[in-house]
Amino acid sequence: MNHVERFRALMAFWPMDRLPRIEWAAWWDNTIERWRREGLPTADRYEMYRYFGLDPYWQCWFGPRAATFPSPPAHGRGMVAGADDYEKVRPHLYPPHDAAIESLHPWAEAQRRGEGVVWITLEGFFWFPRTLFGIERHLYAFYDQPELMHRMNQDLADYHLRVLEAMAKVCRPTFMTFAEDMSYNNGPMLSKAMFDEFLAPYYRQVVPHLAELDILPFIDTDGNVTAMVPWLREVGLKGVLPLERQAGVDAKTLREACPWLRMIGHYDKMVMTRGEEAMRAEFERLLPVMRTGGFVPSVDHQTPPGVSLQDYRTYVGLLAEYTWRAAD
């Protein structure tokens, strides 16, 4: 099987020769710098895939901010306090992505040949208003500025549909993620009622178009997503990543409760400095879920710089072994 056939078969819960081997989140700069000192011959992401024997993929993030969008005063602070501010920054939002879409031509051809999957990211309906309001003001806005929240998300949904229409003329990615980060170690950052009122209507506008294009929709949300998974299904979302182990996520529990759920990630990055025995034990923990289909084991977030080059070589060697074993 080629890379695209294998990924699609896995996500359809069909038999395959082996599971995909991907690093869904590119490595930290500090990690690459360490590995270069330890003998890594390249810092190029795609050459690193080949060097480590990982399956290639290509990701394109279609962000809704133009290059002219003003920088916030500090991390976590936003540029929008109310409707007037939104009107001021709106001319710097929702740019066309003509150049990025044109750049997909070679990726689309490589995907057609089965050489790697194409993945796109769109900003989600929790994530995007947070970038405008700032972290604290965003959480108050659900109660204090509901009309503005709805306007932002309707504008965003309209924008996503325009981007998808233009992109589909060039490339139809294998899967996509909505960047959200709407959960933390204790669960969701919003209630089911808030999700239903402020996010669900806009997912229901965009997700059916993804289905028409045969693009598998995932949510990218850190922390413990477990309680949210049924909410996601209600709006047509099919998968979740990265399923952070340190936040308390358990893929076995999720699989038992949600046999339909596609999952990427969940390999506990904290074991990667503890030697081969600990890394193998983590794969043994995941193996029963790997055998159920619909699950790509991958580091549950970017590989941290505490992991040596030899540690990572050990990890990818075990990944190769267990991706064969899971398909037996």
What are these regions (language model features)?
Residues M1-G39, R90-D328:
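Active-site loop segments of alpha/beta catalytic cores
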Residues P20-E23, S71-A81:
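Short, compositionally biased low-complexity segments
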Residues P41-G63, V170-C171:
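Catalytic domains of carbohydrate-active enzymes, especially glycoside hydrolases
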Residues M48, T68, P95-A99:
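Amphipathic, low-complexity, repeat-rich surface-exposed segments
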Residues Y57, A74-R77, C258:
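Glycine/serine-rich loop-strand microenvironments at binding/catalytic pocket rims
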Residues W61-S71, T121-F126:
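Short, glycine/charge-rich beta-strand/loop segments that flank catalytic centers
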Residues A66, G82, Y315:
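Catalytic cores of transferase enzymes with a strong primary signal for eukaryotic protein kinases
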Residues G78-P91:
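Active-site gating loops and adjacent loop-to-helix segments of metal-dependent hydrolytic enzymes
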